[in-house]
Amino acid sequence: MRVGKCFLGLAACLYAVAADAERVPMKLWYDEPAKVWMTSALPVGNGGIGAMFFGGVAKEQLQFNDKTLWAGSTTRRGAYQNMGDLFFEFDTPETCTNYRRELSLDDAIGRVSYTIDGVDYLREYFASNPDSVIVVRLTTPGHKGKLNFSLRMQDGRQGMTRVDGHTMTIKGTLDLLSYEAQALLQADGGMVETKSDRLEVKGADAVTVVLTGATNFDLASPTYTRGDADEIHRRVSARMDKAARKSYKKLKAAHLADYQPLFARVELDLDAEQPDYTTDVLVREHKDNAYLDMLYFQYGRYLMLGSSRGGQLPSNLQGLWNNVNNPAWECDYHSNINVQMNYWPAEVANLSECYAPFITYVSTEALKDGGSWQQVARKENCRGWAVHTQNNIFGYTDWLINRPANAWYCTHLWQHYAYTLDKEYLRDTAWPVMKVTCQYWFDRLKENAEGRLVAPNEWSPEHGPWEDGVAYAQQLVYALFEETLAAADVLAVDDAFVSELKEKFSRLDNGLHIGSWGQIKEWTIQEDKQGDHQRHLSHLMALYPCDQISYLKDKRYAEAAKVALDSRGDGATGWSRAWKVACWARLWDGERAYRLLKQAQNITDRDGGEHGRQCRRRV
């Protein structure tokens, strides 16, 4: 039985232990407002909707998203969209004292506090999963009647905003989808005036702003939609009405009762205390402080909880946070590493529930009768399904075909069973997908000159020639067959399909071949180039995320993997460096893995640093 042992995905997973002592607070905090969305605004999310807050004093911006809001269709890629923004404009000056902006990972609440003319101002931000809303609370502790500001809502595509009573609404249509978002302002004391494009608060003691939105996206529908604009309005309004009947105290209590038991399952204790300097100073000047490693690990878990709970879609290239309508690579679902990597920490970081959206996405699309994933396979006269590299939420798949991704996705379906031992899930959800995926490869594989079964005309993302028997494909198909046989054993399935699987598995090339300079070979015909610093480690799938290569199994292959990995070098983009960290850990080189981990903790500029500028849009 294969059980993944990764410790880095969205951020990093090192080694999680439960501690008897009082937990060290996990907080990102700063002494000034954010200036740039990508590098300094702070995220909140409930798995389906999310927001980024800047923490401005005279002006505040809350940019928000719904993970299902996409332009595009079943025939056009489109892109993930920015749903909109809330803009707060206060009657206070920009200068203040005691400024603090923080994100508490322990309770998933953002806070901004400062003092002006002896009055303390406090804001709290959170995204509630049980109530499906984003909440902003504004108070002046110890002072009454001091809140004076205007609130404006802006559609991410510059549509009209309707103001009705104390509610603001945006709505619109895209290629396939309709959408709506509402923001409700509730004031304690003072006055609220309704203007044509904003709400104005005067002399309030406290204010609660509740925000929510939805689209008519439905993954299971043949059209990928369910209901019209009126149905969306009813759904959003019902959600808002339910939240509006709760006090802020009850909304917050429900949020904490839902979130904290999940987050508190795991603690990484490296015997470090929370420092008294800001997080940017921690990263820039105190990287040897073990608190940074603790924070990095828990921030990864926080982001997973914020971008992948419930719903029909997994985390995308940016989780679910996006402030533009033309994001890099459309903020899509890349099948050659990115969407899979998002879920590497899920089980080992004890967030198994966060796997559900990815599993739903894969199983629904793979088994959709006549769906686009099945059509890709039919074009090659194969049963089952396959995908290309870039994928939107409507089944559209393009750029280069990535056949082995179907096997890769199935390793995740198996891993979820390996951790949960949920036999019902294995039988009803994972097994049907794994079976038809094997059938795809039954039809696709061919016999080589040595009598072994190989995948014809495959590549090694994202470089090199197309050849038969490329390591990337062979290692993944090997893992698929091995794990499907393990699933058959658990489910006591012994039929003609299993017999064929056993026969083909016995003849399958495992993709493990040692080359002329002692490396795991990437291709069978082309000689690997020593010193090739390609970001992908596709010829080392068997090392990580799969586990055919291990010092515990065969030292020769482990040593050859080490040679190949060392040849790739230590330079990398963020995701590639994470992969290298995991691989070096599998090779029992903790020093090298930790050195790369510390490199990953560098502050990134807006363009993603040197490698970010190199990795521009390809299509």
Where is each model-derived feature located?
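Extended, hydrophobic alpha-helical segments in both membrane/secreted and soluble proteins
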Residues: N338, N402-H416, T429-D443, S576, ...
